[in-house]
């Protein structure tokens, strides 16, 4: 065992108090007897991707949804799992840390021990590298004692490397075989759960008995689809960020002479930025999805900000707070094109010092226009998954620099008559992702850990643990599991030659829905936020009393219970089968045929339109 992992922490009084909190379980998971109902087989979201995904997942595509129900539930096809033989389970943190991750381990450990005291849970030390090297720590009550309801991943450590290459996949197979694991639980975001799906398929093909289960844990909030409502860590991250942002808003209003540019960690998409805006009400937020949809250039964005600064100055307001998602650089078309060209040259082995001379004329002109600090950051080698090192690219400083340049120009020309523009820049991310998890994240992660046990007890492979109806109290949460392959989509790239390159099936990160209720709420208030300084301070994360049960605004305003609606549809179909049987009247039969024909026509049309909208990059 690595002595750096699993050692008892020294806890502050608040940490000690939090370690004593025991999360609640929804009724369906209480007790030792749980029913599992396997529904209809799943399909993929885009019909046009089906044949590609089917080739990649011959063993794990089309598996049914699983619903976990209380023992007393009267569902004809739901089975009670009565046998609980001894299990050996491995668990690994993949990807970046998110508040609440430790509670997934705790929940799984408790479920294992409740159902059979001889069960064993092994934590892999150092993430996927520990998996490949078979470095493990047996999870015990003593190990867990100072990590319950605590932030970080320091109990086991983590890695951001994938489980993707032939060598890595074979190492994972060997580890699970050598350690005689019945199940491997992978904790992470879109990339880690994509790897979990491919690993589950590889294990099935290799006739390995180890079942692979994924858990949606990421601060980015971008592992969202019809099965997954929220990610562990997102709630805490947004609450911590929102407190910091609101403190800055108060400072801006007090001094009345600074514009704060705040970049927020969250990868390519803007879920964190949107949620923090809804919680703290800064003056502006630049969402990457808006930039992409409107094809805004860097100069369009600068003009938007400068016009806002000028309009506020006309009301004698020379201060403000502007939020920027860290992925904005990948949403600005000319910067993204430059970044891809640089990454292509780095991949070809071109030395960093020679990159600027190898760029196309258009990219070279843009590169030379940029300030030196941004040039240096754009030249950084990409991450192990080929994505840009977004946390290292100081987009907020680039925007502040260009806005200041433009405002000085306007001041000199006499078109701007306000005070001299002063900018202060911040980057929030690391401050939040190691925070003590919120009550919601503690509960959610702990419940997901329990769900993982029931997935493996049901013998399911290639599934993700899911909990729905999350905006309601815990006693109304619905627990289940969905095949990860059903969450896959395929991207297509149009080449200059007119041909199309097709990517591998993956879980693509969800973008902010510009037709969704959360975004609509922002748009309704954007002008007031901009001009009226409606700053809101939610305060620190609350663990008890008023505010402790508060949840993300974006979670509460959306209507997301997809799996609940699937069950409701199944109930309607069952009722139709009960009513329309041989021997029913002609009138009943005619009405059923007419209605079903109309419904089928409508669904076929909708399905065809969604298929034609394939993802191109």
Swiss-Prot record:
Q: Tell me which InterPro entries the record gives.
A: PfpB_PPi_PFK, Phosphofructokinase_dom, PKF_sf
Q: What are the subcellular locations of this protein?
A: Cytoplasm
Q: In which pathway does it act?
A: Carbohydrate degradation; glycolysis; D-glyceraldehyde 3-phosphate and glycerone phosphate from D-glucose: step 3/4
What Gene Ontology terms describe where this protein resides (cellular component)? mitochondrion
Q: Which Pfam families match?
A: PFK (PF00365)
Expressed in which tissues: Expressed in roots and specific parts such as the trichomes of leaves, cotyledon veins, as well as in stamen and gynoecium of flowers.
**BP terms from Gene Ontology:** photosynthesis
Coiled-coil parts of chain: none
Q: Which SUPFAM superfamilies does the UniProt entry name for this protein?
A: Phosphofructokinase (SSF53784)
Q: Indicate the transmembrane segments per the record.
A: none
**Origin superkingdom:** Eukaryota
Which GO molecular function entries does the Swiss-Prot or TrEMBL record give? 6-phosphofructokinase activity; ATP binding; diphosphate-fructose-6-phosphate 1-phosphotransferase activity; metal ion binding
Keywords (A to Z) from UniProt: Allosteric enzyme, Cytoplasm, Glycolysis, Kinase, Magnesium, Metal-binding, Transferase
What is the activity regulation entry? Allosterically activated by fructose 2,6-bisphosphate.
Q: What does this protein do?
A: Regulatory subunit of pyrophosphate--fructose 6-phosphate 1-phosphotransferase.
Q: Which family does it belong to?
A: Belongs to the phosphofructokinase type A (PFKA) family. PPi-dependent PFK group II subfamily. Clade 'Long' sub-subfamily.
Q: How does it assemble?
A: Tetramer of two alpha (regulatory) and two beta (catalytic) chains.
- What is the recorded name of this protein? Pyrophosphate--fructose 6-phosphate 1-phosphotransferase subunit alpha 2
Q: Native species of this protein?
A: Arabidopsis thaliana (Mouse-ear cress)
